[in-house]
Amino acid sequence: MLAAPLPSFSTDAFDQVVMSTYGRFPITLVRGEGCRVWDDQGRSYLDFVAGIATCTLGHAHPALVETVSRQMQTLHHVSNLYYIPQQGALAQWLVAHSCGDRVFFCNSGAEANEAAIKLARKYAHTVRHIANPIIITAQASFHGRTLATITATGQPKYQKYFDPLVPGFAYVPYNDLGALEALVASLDQPQPQVAAILLEPLQGEGGVRPGDRAYFEQVRQLCTEKGILLIFDEVQVGMGRTGSLWGYETLGVEPDIFTSAKGLAGGVPIGAMIAKEFCAVFQPGDHASTFGGNPLATAAALTVCETLEKENLLENVRDRGQQLRTGLQELAAAYPQVIAEVRGWGLINGLELQPDTPLTAAEVVKAALAEGLLLVPAGPKVVRFVPPLIVSATEIDMALGAMSRALAHLAA
């Protein structure tokens, strides 16, 4: 494989010209293959970040490399004013493998959630005749960085300094049916105002907190009884990461609308909003995306979808996820003064630190980095493990070994 030419730059020069929106770790990654990446000094790392649950097939997967290379040589972008075969084929696959009927393509999870919010509002106005629709979301949720999606996000730290926020959102504790029922009853007086309930099947950025099956079943019943749309944000958990293709399948509850992005095209930018026919009320001019559904991104995504099936990756996710959780639970037993809980589904798992330990998730991530393992925080006290779905049993064992060494160093 030919290596891409590497621009010559220093991290100091980088920091002088790139806006400071990230707190970066002090390594420069230049190459990847499978579940490994290499820095500019030639050191390799086991990648359990995967671009934050994005590199579904790992790095430089032959099928994805071949598809993207071929598509770039053929046709990489045209306007949605024309029919795009790859887009149609991907939409067909998504509809055939989900509860949805119609697909809107965009470029990211935030854009997909924006599309879902707009669709829910239009449905509320045109079908239910709600003048001022309200969408309920969960506290500690995360739905994106645009103005509407940070408003939907139930974490004030993401909203600070961006007032005035978008009106029409309300918040309840996650997995708390009583609080949700009370809020709906309050908002729907004297007439209905609740247009939709937007939830993550598992809260990712909020600390890797799985949804409670009984709670979601009752939320589904509530929405059906009142005509409220149920929207699932599947951006981080969808495309096989939970061990099912979609997080809603893990819960056994179907939404009316759901969103996908991150892992859908294995690292090529894409987003999708999938809706059931009855609420797919968009008409020409209601919404659009210049790059959404372009031939390159949709060809890549279709290859990811087909590879999930061909390589039986859902079974691998379930097996390797159980192996990882078992190993993390053993580490929790060995370091009870540090680790409070291990939780997750499939290959999205969180290790929560004890509330009284001075250690932060960022410090644990830095210690793991020194041992050649890339991890990512999910809040101040939770370390997140989201490796590529192709991860092997040997690589899980190596990651657990690196974590053991990191914890031993921190506990010393």
Curated annotation (Swiss-Prot):
Location of the protein in the cell: Cytoplasm
Positions bound to pyridoxal 5'-phosphate: G109, A110, F142, D233, E234, V235, Q236, T290
Pathway(s) this gene product operates in, as recorded in its UniProt entry: Amino-acid biosynthesis; L-arginine biosynthesis; N(2)-acetyl-L-ornithine from L-glutamate: step 4/4
Gene3D superfamilies: Aspartate Aminotransferase, domain 1 (3.90.1150.10), Type I PLP-dependent aspartate aminotransferase-like (Major domain) (3.40.640.10)
Gene Ontology biological process terms, A to Z: L-arginine biosynthetic process
First-level EC class: transferase
Cofactor binding note of this UniProt entry: Binds 1 pyridoxal phosphate per subunit.
Subunit text: Homodimer.
Similarity comment: Belongs to the class-III pyridoxal-phosphate-dependent aminotransferase family. ArgD subfamily.
Additional remarks: May also have succinyldiaminopimelate aminotransferase activity, thus carrying out the corresponding step in lysine biosynthesis.
Protein known as: Acetylornithine aminotransferase
Gene: argD
